Amino acid sequence: MTDFSPREIVSELDRFIVGQADAKRAVSIALRNRWRRLQLDTGLREEVLPKNILMIGPTGVGKTEIARRLAKLAGAPFLKVEATKFTEVGYVGRDVEQIIRDLVEVAIHQVRERKRKDVAARAQLAAEERVLDALVGANSSAATRDSFRRKLRAGELNDKEIEIETQSSGGGMPMFEIPGMPGAQMGAISIGDIFGKLGGRTKTRRVTVEASHDILIAEESDKLLDSDQLVQEAINVVENNGIVFLDEIDKICVRENRHGGDVSREGVQRDLLPLIEGTTVSTKHGAVKTDHILFIASGAFHIAKPSDLLPELQGRLPIRVELQALTRDDMRRILTEPEASLIKQYVALMKTEGVTLDITDDAIDALADVAVAVNSTVENIGARRLQTVMERVLDDISFTASDRTGETMRVDAAYVQQHIGDLAKNADLSRFIL
């Protein structure tokens, strides 16, 4: 769990996302409150519940990107899901409890990777011994093993092929699927796990010494880990630090004066209520309490309104943040300011072909103008429009770059207008092309 202050979290988000100060403040405070809660006495800690967030704003303004960057920053189990993927209990499809099961799997993977690093040195030595066994045999003399160990560490044997015994991942086991629920898994128990543990099968693989390195280290690391303790720690991390980002929540609103076809939409909202309020979900690894999992919901709310959500669900999302539509200046900043801005990406991509791409300031202004103009006349898809416009403008350069190694390609405002100006002005054409 990160111990960054809210100000530091906002400055980290500023490196990748332009504007939206209110949303950044809200998520930074929520993330810091996770850390603050863990500093409290046990009794009070149980009483402090997370303040869930509802982000409201048009598409393409940074809602999902804020969540994505927050996940990397938090170092906590994080899951992004679309609310539209779930159906009411009793209907065909995934039920909302699958969110928590998936979050537990994410946490187990995170905890395992962290613990593998702790035992990496011991696992490295054990893996080295297994490689030497494959090269010279388990009964070889100490002198022979030392000689080969020196060659192995010097990298002289990297290309040599060896046969190693590895744990079978149970690939031969048929998948157990619940009829009528594609992609659903048994929550309480996994049939594959039972047979995998009973079988304990190994298989022989023929790989190079270099390729065997990662396989054997991962296997030896797992032997040194206590799997029960690992799972228990992962569940504890989920219960105290887990974050769920519920995207497209406006799509499960039941709009006023609308009848028929919406039964399972309202049902999904009702199923989400106990999950967000706090309940216990059964997973194949054990029971997980959701009382202290932070939920961040987001939606464009173009057609529906936040008030169309069930009143109980509105009450469980107490912090409302409105994200602003992007202006021309925002579009310009998005092209240049973030660490991995679109301009930097295209320049780097062309450099791989030996082509220097020179995009002038007036070209950046022209690109921003075109994106804003098309957004206002066709459909406002926010910053995503910039990708469409950039692809259109740089289409010729991308296609012929491999034939122009060593050249410098200059893109200015005139070049932008030549390749896209007429399309942007013609609303009917841009409706289909941009």
UniProtKB/Swiss-Prot annotation:
ATPase subunit of a proteasome-like degradation complex; this subunit has chaperone activity. The binding of ATP and its subsequent hydrolysis by HslU are essential for unfolding of protein substrates subsequently hydrolyzed by HslV. HslU recognizes the N-terminal part of its protein substrates and unfolds these before they are guided to HslV for hydrolysis. The gene is hslU. One of its GO terms (cellular component) is HslUV protease complex. Keywords: ATP-binding, Chaperone, Cytoplasm, Nucleotide-binding, Stress response. GO terms for molecular function: ATP binding; ATP hydrolysis activity; peptidase activity; proteasome-activating activity. This is ATP-dependent protease ATPase subunit HslU. SMART domains: AAA, ClpB_D2-small. ATP binds at residues 18, 60-65, 247, 312, 384.
